[in-house]
Amino acid sequence: MYPVNLKLSIKFLFYFFLYFLLIIIIYGVYLYFKINQVIHGKIWKFPISIYSRIVTLEPGNNYSKKDIIAILKSNRYKQVNFLTMPGEFLVKRNSLILIRRSFNFPEGFEDKISIKLLFDKNKLVRIVHLSNNRNFSILRLDPQLIAMIYSPKGEKRLFVSQKNYPKALIQTLLTIEDKCFYNHYGINFYSMFRAFFVNLISGHSIQGGSTLTQQLVKNLFLTNIRSLWRKINEIYMALILDFQYSKEKILELYLNEVYLGQDKNEQIRGFALASLYYFGRPINELRLDECALLVGMVKGASLYNPWNNPVLTLNRRNLVLYVLFKHKVINRTLYEKLKSKPLNIQSRGNIIWFRSAFVQIVEKEFQKKVGYYFQNFSGIKIFTTLDLISQIAAENAIRHGIQQLKKKYKLQDLEASMVIIDRFSGEIRGVLGSSNPNLLGYNRAIQAKRSIGSLSKPITYLAALSQPEYFRLNTWIPDTPIKIKMQNGKLWKPQNNNFEFVGKVMLIDALKNSMNVPIVHLSMKLGLKKIVQTWIQLGLSSNHIFKYPSIALGSINLTSMEVAKIFQVISSGGNKANIISIRSVLSENNKLIYHSFPQSKQVISAQASYLTLYAMQSVVSSGTAKHLGKFFKNMHLAGKTGTTNNLVDSWFVGIDGRQVVIVWIGRDNNKTTKCYGSTGAMKIYHNYLKLNNPKPLLLIPPRDVYFLNINKSGDFMCFRSYSKYFRAIPVWIRNHNIFCT
């Protein structure tokens, strides 16, 4: 017989054990449902991903081999000697061969594909599918991720399924972090006890014993506060997670959840996004040494940051490679080869994460077209009109140009904005709202209304040339002193820049030399009503326009974007296009939410637009922008300089065969820039063209426009004898013989 006290003790322990077991079971059920709710629900809320434009190649289109190489490089394709994986291309004499990446386009998913692009006289003539030698009529190139915004909980990530991760990355990860991943049940007791004793002997934590499953539990379900209770929860939840889900599912979650760095105040989560962040390429295109770098960062992404601590990171990567060698994952030859490689990360400045000015425009358009704020969505993909080549060229042109001007004029507060749009479709190809491309806040491209100066002159000439029975390019305009009584009773006496008068000047020469007095005479003859009507036809709201004679000289305040809209119409034969930044929007599950279609409307006669644009070409060839014309002789560029009183604003509008570009330079305090349009804004445009090769602006005369010879006096000369004073000008007439009677 046992003593009574002993029986009671055994009974007490028995019931205590039962209650304890019951509590563990109940708590386990609670954890089970908690895990289940997260895993089977929406594990993550994703940020909004914004992509550059999707370039579509077609035989016969305007892309040269050089253009396509530039596009591929801007989309982070790698030029190689031998093709091995998607995202690579090689160059041959009259062809390009590439492996186009798989991508979920708005029109649907397209798998990776090997393509040969054939050129004749530097023009794309054939697109050949290499696997079956079939011709393609079109080829879409995958776009570049340019921004991720509205990151829930301050976490950025791109979800990639486990099957799309390279085997080299997974093998490296398991070798370094959890060799027994496929053999344990969520926890590895041997590793835990080993780490416990190592840390106990050293007196501080130097080794971890957590499995990938435990690390995942910590990231998904637990706080960062270290405690015994957290460790108990971690072990229990790891066992439940391992019991409930397959190893592949757990691995997939880990690959997309692990912390791998910081982008300002937002966390970089998952290997897929880290690959873009550090290397600028998708995860499936990384080499083994690059995979080793990312796996090495798992131990401490801040400590092993390749930008902040490159030497430490290199040593850590090489240690990972050494472990792979010791475990016979790689041989000595490969180990020696890989450890000698540099880190190969992209420079921090090349991370295209946030084009703030452009993203502001995208957000505004999204709200207008879709009817909701960005914050209401998770994981949507927005495909924009942004051309990376143009945008990066603009950023570099502004950055270097403003730096030179600041130094030259000793003005440290010079600011700038730049707008680039497609002259036909109206799609925005690039935007800068500041001299610092990545500066958040005030977007001068769409918020800063500034006096446009002489940029208004082409609109007055357009109004005149719309009346061919009264005005032609060879029409003489007075250049004599003029006094105009203003509404306040004061007399306005406009002057030319050189304070001289020549008596009279032909319309085309008045425009190309940006003369002030002739255009005032012209505007008085036209009437302010006609000029205002032309501005409104071009798309400007009547609220912007004050009916004063000085409107002819630019006493009108507009943003760079509003100026771009005006000159888009003139550059496209009088067709007003919708200025857009968004092509398509996909939902989180890749359903099409929104798609834009190019639309335009004829608002100005094609003939008057042609004549105005032709005159603007003379500005570049022999007028106020002739220095630009010297560098781009065969491009037939059109342009117009703009300068406001006291050199407060410096403007330039440049037009080539594909783009309208507006550049503004000024100071936020409205003090002088010391720059004319030709010495400030035009210099920026010049830099831009050097970085982004222009296309020739080849104008085709519309119906009823003919080229006729005129002499020095502006008279039409119908005989064919040669004279150095002859020049041909386009004339809008229905019967050209009328001038030769």
From Swiss-Prot:
Q: According to its UniProt record, what is one Pfam family this protein matches?
A: Transgly
The record's region (Transpeptidase) falls at 395-687
Q: How does it sit in the membrane?
A: Single-pass type II membrane protein
The listed locations are: Cell membrane
Catalytic activity field: [GlcNAc-(1->4)-Mur2Ac(oyl-L-Ala-gamma-D-Glu-L-Lys-D-Ala-D-Ala)](n)-di-trans,octa-cis-undecaprenyl diphosphate + beta-D-GlcNAc-(1->4)-Mur2Ac(oyl-L-Ala-gamma-D-Glu-L-Lys-D-Ala-D-Ala)-di-trans,octa-cis-undecaprenyl diphosphate = [GlcNAc-(1->4)-Mur2Ac(oyl-L-Ala-gamma-D-Glu-L-Lys-D-Ala-D-Ala)](n+1)-di-trans,octa-cis-undecaprenyl diphosphate + di-trans,octa-cis-undecaprenyl diphosphate + H(+); Preferential cleavage: (Ac)2-L-Lys-D-Ala-|-D-Ala. Also transpeptidation of peptidyl-alanyl moieties that are N-acyl substituents of D-alanine
Q: Where is this region: Transglycosylase?
A: 139-311
Taxonomically, the superkingdom here is Bacteria
Segments spanning the bilayer are 13-33
Q: List residues in topological domain: Extracellular.
A: 34-741
UniProt-listed InterPro entries: Beta-lactam/transpept-like, Glyco_trans_51, Glycosyltr_51/Transpeptidase, Lysozyme-like_dom_sf, PBP_1b, PBP_transglycosylase, PCN-bd_Tpept, UB2H
> Catalytic center at which residues?
177 (proton donor), 454 (acyl-ester intermediate)
Q: Could you tell me which Gene3D superfamilies the record lists for this protein?
A: Biosynthetic peptidoglycan transglycosylase-like, DD-peptidase/beta-lactamase superfamily, Penicillin-binding protein 1b domain
Task: Kindly indicate whether the keyword Disulfide bond belongs to this entry.
Answer: no
Q: In which pathway does it act?
A: Cell wall biogenesis; peptidoglycan biosynthesis
Q: What is its EC number?
A: 2.4.99.28, 3.4.16.4
Q: Which PANTHER family match?
A: BINDING PROTEIN TRANSPEPTIDASE, PUTATIVE-RELATED, PENICILLIN-BINDING PROTEIN 1B
Protein family (similarity comment)? In the N-terminal section; belongs to the glycosyltransferase 51 family. In the C-terminal section; belongs to the transpeptidase family.
Q: What does this protein do?
A: Cell wall formation. Synthesis of cross-linked peptidoglycan from the lipid intermediates. The enzyme has a penicillin-insensitive transglycosylase N-terminal domain (formation of linear glycan strands) and a penicillin-sensitive transpeptidase C-terminal domain (cross-linking of the peptide subunits).
User: What is the protein's given name?
Assistant: Penicillin-binding protein 1B
> What organism is this sequence from?
Buchnera aphidicola subsp. Baizongia pistaciae (strain Bp)
Q: Provide the taxonomic classification.
A: Bacteria, Pseudomonadati, Pseudomonadota, Gammaproteobacteria, Enterobacterales
Q: Which gene encodes it?
A: mrcB
